[in-house]
UniProtKB/Swiss-Prot annotation:
Belongs to the universal ribosomal protein uS7 family. One of the primary rRNA binding proteins, it binds directly to 16S rRNA where it nucleates assembly of the head domain of the 30S subunit. Is located at the subunit interface close to the decoding center, probably blocks exit of the E-site tRNA. The keyword Secreted does not apply. GO terms for molecular function: rRNA binding; structural constituent of ribosome; tRNA binding. It comes from Carsonella ruddii (strain PV). This is Small ribosomal subunit protein uS7. InterPro entries: Ribosomal_uS7, Ribosomal_uS7_bac/org-type, Ribosomal_uS7_CS, Ribosomal_uS7_dom, Ribosomal_uS7_dom_sf. GO terms for biological process: translation. Keywords: Ribonucleoprotein, Ribosomal protein, RNA-binding, rRNA-binding, tRNA-binding.
Amino acid sequence: MSRKKRYFKTVILNDPKFGSYIIAKFINYIMNNGKKNLAQKIFYYSISIISIRLNKNPFILIKKILYNVQPNFEIKKKKIGGSFYKIPIKINLKRSLMFSMKWIVKNSKLRNENGYKNKLVGELIDSYYNNSLSTKQKDELNKIIDQNKAYSNFKI
């Protein structure tokens, strides 16, 4: 019998404004040092600016932005016969959303604008139009996947 305690997944509550699990996860990725209130203010500010600029529903905009950035495959390395191969693996929706949110947050921090709010707004608008660093990162991943399609029959 195992002596370890069972791990129970923490339940993430939907965000208060839109009632969406996806937006609550996005806010959690933005959050730094446990300051969720600040992360919510940053996210809702950036969403309001984007919806004003593009004249569209903010919830639909976020779904479209995440769809533009999310990958369908992931690369894993496996050692076969003394050499490592990059093997493309299809991933589920939750994992692809996780990658897209992480990429957007990471690449928004690299932008050259004043304040994180403006950086996030710029990255989200560029992601909507497929011009952002996040979409370029997705395209680079797709190139690697195309190069290594021959190894897709290997099991991990």
